[in-house]
UniProtKB/Swiss-Prot annotation:
Residues 384-455 are annotated as: Disordered. InterPro entries: DUF6350. Pfam families: DUF6350 (PF19877). It is found in: Cell membrane. It is a multi-pass membrane protein. This is Uncharacterized protein Mb0980. Keywords: Cell membrane, Membrane, Transmembrane, Transmembrane helix. It comes from Mycobacterium bovis (strain ATCC BAA-935 / AF2122/97).
Length: 455
């Protein structure tokens, strides 16, 4: 009975990691596929359309969640919403973090990462096959590039898997390498700076929508149906991170563009923009002086980076290196977001931000303002002053002690004179002529004579 229960426990323990790996491989992708299928079928039912090409549309939208451009009727939709992508990265990071523990071995970590990448790649291959099959029925639907599809899926899930695994075993991995210990603090400072920049830019975007409320109502007026207005609201929510990234670019001194329309903190060039309510937040010419104050957002994000770097005081060189690593990491993250949030938008042209100026702007604010914050917050530790050795004390000739023979221990251990005088001579000394004490001598009585009686 005990053997049967032990074998059952072993099988259950072995099945647990297998279930975790399957969940990591297909969990986020299957959940996204289910949501996309429900939304697509609901739209087809509301539009009273047939289900022809429904599976091709579902597969195209699943690839679109991974920033794969969709081509319909010869027109490319390259500007994909960032919100589904960020949710996919978060779901992948969460699943990998749950399957990994701080004590996981390297083999377990490799299996988790391989599962997080292998499952989505398999689903991408199936989606490409479904789209290719549906394109024979729906001629307007075009199969995307396989290389672009696999690359986008791999990058999105790699970012999520790396984030989840790093949150569990990052410190242990750093301790096992020759990299400095403050590298983890630099990553945290970069994350704080990016979140501060995006969060404050989101607040500015919301405030701009309130200011341009009339323009937003006009954009909602392009449709009279409730379902159409609901669809515009959903699209605005999905594309809100794209607009926030554009606002962040403007806040650090870069620019954002929608076709020929260009927006920055110093000038606005007009042009046609899509009728999307979230785009009502874009500034309109002539540009007021309040938009120049948007640069305060970039400075505030630099303060957030400096505060995180100053939590652990380091010497000058190490503190500077930690801040530079955080600034470079934050600039790279913003560049990736700017690249992912842009693309080709049909007849409107290219949509996105000036990525080169965005990287330079983030580096400037994170480094300059961050360094000032580190200095003020006490993030630089001073080296202790070296104590000068005390000068030797010179003794006078009168105060000098006589030399002591350190190697002759018998000289310092001679018995006192009184002890040496009280010791009686031995038989050898008497034989050599040494006179032994007699009873008449004023000395101690001999041991064989009785002591004298007092009269």
């Amino acid at each position: 009975m005990n053997r049967v229960s032990a074998s059952a426990d072993d099988r259950a323990a072995g099945a647990r990691p297998a279930r975790d790996l399957v969940r990591v491989a297909f969990g986020p992708g299957v959940v996204a596929l289910g949501i996309i299928a429900a939304v697509t079928l609901l739209q087809l039912l509301i539009a009273n359309s047939d289900m022809t090409g429904a599976w091709g549309a579902i597969a195209s939208m699943w690839l679109g969640v991974h920033l794969v451009p969709i081509s319909i009727g010869g027109r490319a939709l390259g500007v994909m919403p960032l919100l589904p992508v960020l949710l996919m990265v978060w779901a992948t990071a969460r699943s990998t973090a749950r399957a990994t523990s701080p004590q996981s071995s390297g083999l377990v970590v490799r299996w988790v990462v391989a599962s997080a990448l292998g499952g989505p790649l398999l689903m991408a291959a199936i989606a490409l096959a479904v789209i290719h099959d549906a394109s024979s029925v729906v001629t307007e639907l075009q199969t995307p590039s396989a290389l672009r599809a696999f690359t986008s899926v791999l990058v999105v899930h790699s970012v999520g898997a790396a984030t989840g695994v790093w949150s569990r075993v990052g410190r242990r991995a750093l301790a096992a390498t020759a990299l400095p210990d403050w590298l983890h603090d630099s990553m945290r400072a970069a994350a704080a700076g990016v979140l501060a920049l995006l969060g404050l830019s989101g607040v500015v975007t919301a405030g701009s929508l309130v200011v341009h409320w009339a323009t937003m109502q006009e954009l909602y007026g392009i449709t009279d149906s409730i379902f159409g207005q609901f669809s515009l609201t959903v699209l605005s929510v999905l594309y809100a991170p794209n607009v926030i990234v554009g606002t962040s670019a403007i806040a650090v001194g870069s620019s954002a563009h929608i076709g020929f329309a260009t927006f920055s903190s110093f000038a606005v060039l007009g042009g046609d923009i899509p009728a999307l309510p979230i785009l009502a937040a874009a500034p309109t010419p002539p540009l007021g002086p309040a938009w120049v104050a948007l640069l305060i957002v970039g400075a505030s994000s630099g303060v957030a980076v400096g505060q995180q770097c100053a939590r652990r005081a380091l010497p000058f060189v190490a503190a500077m290196a930690k801040l530079l690593v955080a600034a470079v990491a934050g600039a790279l993250v913003m560049a990736v977001l700017g690249y992912g949030g842009g693309g080709r938008l049909g007849n409107f042209g290219d949509v996105g931000v000036d990525e080169g100026a965005l990287v330079l702007g983030v580096l400037f604010w994170f480094t300059f303002v961050g360094w000032v914050t580190v200095v003020i917050a006490g993030g630089i530790s001073r080296r202790p002053k070296r104590l000068r050795p005390a000068p030797p004390v010179e003794l006078d000739a009168d105060e000098s002690s006589p030399p002591v023979d350190m190697f002759d221990g018998a000289a310092s251990e001679q018995p006192p004179a009184s002890v040496a005088e009280d010791v009686p001579p031995s038989h050898d000394d008497i034989a050599n002529g040494l006179k032994a004490p007699t009873a008449d001598d004023e000395a101690l009585p001999l041991s064989d004579e009785p002591p004298p009686r007092a009269d």
